[in-house]
Curated annotation (Swiss-Prot):
The keyword Chloroplast applies. Transmembrane segments: none annotated. GO terms for cellular component: chloroplast; mitochondrial small ribosomal subunit. It comes from the Eukaryota. It is found in: Plastid, Chloroplast. Keywords: Chloroplast, Plastid, Ribonucleoprotein, Ribosomal protein. This is Small ribosomal subunit protein uS2c. One of its GO terms (molecular function) is structural constituent of ribosome. It comes from Eucalyptus globulus subsp. globulus (Tasmanian blue gum).
Length: 236
């Protein structure tokens, strides 16, 4: 895997608050190598290590995108949801930003069935056929469609398991992470000072609570994915 320069700037990360961790009482001792200091009762993440692992992650996703691989971005908490959707749409990635339905990956056949139902209902709605049904039936199917749009809208074009999964908050998305580990799907994970750095394939120590921090990390990864996709289009 070729190493590239991704313009990862320590000052920019400080401005986004990437270095602010959790309170010192909430830490995971396994994060000790990634913590540089304690300040006013909170741990401070070592941004040099953040830059190193973010750069590694950018190299990985660039390489994967340049070979036509598929990505899934997961971040369902309120502070992450909007940034996840924007980043995924920009890079033409699949995403989950509302709720992780247990078994979404490990029980892929069920997810696939739901996606087929979702696509069929969307087709029916676009063709105006739902409005020709009795009111009660139409209302029920529209509720189903709304529910499927909420939870599966970000993966509606997914036809198989993703090649790489990017996870915004390890603790919040622990079920998704465990499913990836079970299936052997490579993961890139933002980890705050209360997380376990050994679970993901690449763990990026960073503030997973601040919107600016989440957005900065996702923007770097998405830029690398877009660059990789451009390379794939030029050299299929």
């Amino acid at each position: 895997m070729t190493r590239r320069y991704w313009n990862i700037n320590l000052e920019e990360m400080m401005e986004a608050g990437v270095h602010f961790g959790h309170g010192t009482r909430k830490w995971n001792p396994r994060m000790a190598p990634y913590i540089s200091a304690k300040r006013k009762g909170i741990h401070i993440t070592n941004l040099t290590k953040t830059a190193r692992f973010l750069s590694e992650a950018c190299d990985l996703v660039f390489d994967a995108a340049s070979r036509g691989k598929q990505f899934l971005i997961v971040g369902t908490k309120n502070k992450a949801a909007d940034s996840v959707a924007r980043a995924a749409i920009r890079a033409r990635c699949h995403y989950v930003n509302k709720k992780w339905l247990g078994g979404m990956l490990t029980n892929w056949s069920t997810t696939e069935t739901r996606l087929h139902k979702f696509r069929d209902l969307r087709t029916e709605q676009k063709a105006g056929r739902l409005n020709r049904l009795p009111k009660r039936d139409a209302a029920m199917l529209k509720r189903q469609l709304s529910h499927l749009q909420t939870y599966l809208g970000g993966i509606k074009y997914m036809t198989g398991l993703p090649d790489i999964v990017i996870i915004v908050d390890q603790q919040e998305e622990y079920t998704a992470l465990r499913e990836c580990i079970t299936l052997g799907i490579p993961t890139i994970c933002l980890i705050d000072t209360n997380c376990d750095p050994d679970l993901a394939d690449i763990s990026i120590p960073a503030n997973d609570d601040a919107i600016a921090s989440i957005r900065l990390i996702l923007n770097k990864l998405v830029f690398a994915i877009c660059e990789g996709r451009s390379s794939y289009i030029r050299n299929p």
